[in-house]
A protein has these predicted regions:
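N-terminal flexible segment immediately upstream of the FAD-binding catalytic core
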Residues: 1-54, 70-101, 151
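Generic secondary-structure signature for well-ordered alpha-helical cores
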Residues: 4, 8-12, 58-61, 116-123, ...
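A short, flexible low-complexity segment enriched in Lys/Arg and Gly/Pro that occurs
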Residues: 36-57, 105-124
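Short hydrophobic alpha-helical runs that function as membrane-insertion/retention elements
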Residues: 64-65, 126
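Short, ordered loop/turn segments at secondary-structure junctions
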Residues: 67-69, 130
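Anion-binding (especially nucleotide phosphate/pyrophosphate-binding) glycine-rich loop
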Residues: 77-90, 96-135
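Hydrophobic, small-residue-rich alpha-helical packing segments that form membrane-like cores
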Residues: 113, 131-133, 138-158
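Conserved small/polar residues in nucleotide/adenosyl-binding loops
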Residues: 159-166
Length: 167
């Protein structure tokens, strides 16, 4: 498969290394991977994600999201190869509104990273699925955990609002 366009704008944040592709071919589920992705990308913002998805759409290549790999659902498996989008470089808090008790974050930020960022505000992010999952992964799996009875699941705490300012 030809990936020059992706290599062009991602540089060293694009790889076809077999070892890294194997690492991204599974999560913590019991499912045994039958295939591996063709390429792994590490975008840093939604514009880059959009370019990767546009490229994949034009070439009819499957896209597989990957957070920290701690999911139990098997959704990171590359059933037909494809391009994995690893969100680990998208780990920033974009905006924190202490008065409103909310924030805007990128999908790759982990629960621990977010809680470390907001710890001095008196706020905390209560969803604790047991692993240090990314918030994007938590949203994808509708995560819950040990604090669910008191604070609810990720679905109870989540509001998404895609807009040009998010890019």
């Amino acid at each position: 498969m030809e990936f020059n366009e992706l290599k062009g704008f991602l540089g060293d944040r694009f790889t076809t290394s077999k070892a890294i592709r194997i690492e991204h071919s599974h999560d913590e589920s019991w499912h045994v991977p039958q295939n591996i992705p063709d390429a792994i990308t590490y975008p840093e913002n939604t514009n880059e994600v959009s370019k990767i998805i546009s490229f994949a759409y034009k070439k009819n290549i499957p896209v597989i999201p990957f957070g920290t790999g701690t999911a139990l659902e098997g959704h990171t498996h590359a059933l037909k190869g494809g391009i994995t989008i690893n969100s680990s470089n998208m780990n920033q808090v974009i905006e924190l509104n202490n008065a409103d008790m909310d924030c805007r974050v990128q999908a790759g930020i982990t629960r621990k990273e977010l809680n470390n960022y907001i710890k001095d505000t008196g706020l905390f992010f209560p969803v604790d699925p047991g692993a240090d999952a990314s918030l994007g992964g938590m949203c994808a799996t509708r995560a819950s955990g040990t604090n669910t009875v008191r604070y609810g699941t990720i679905s109870c705490l989540l509001y998404t609002s895609p807009s040009p300012r998010d890019r």
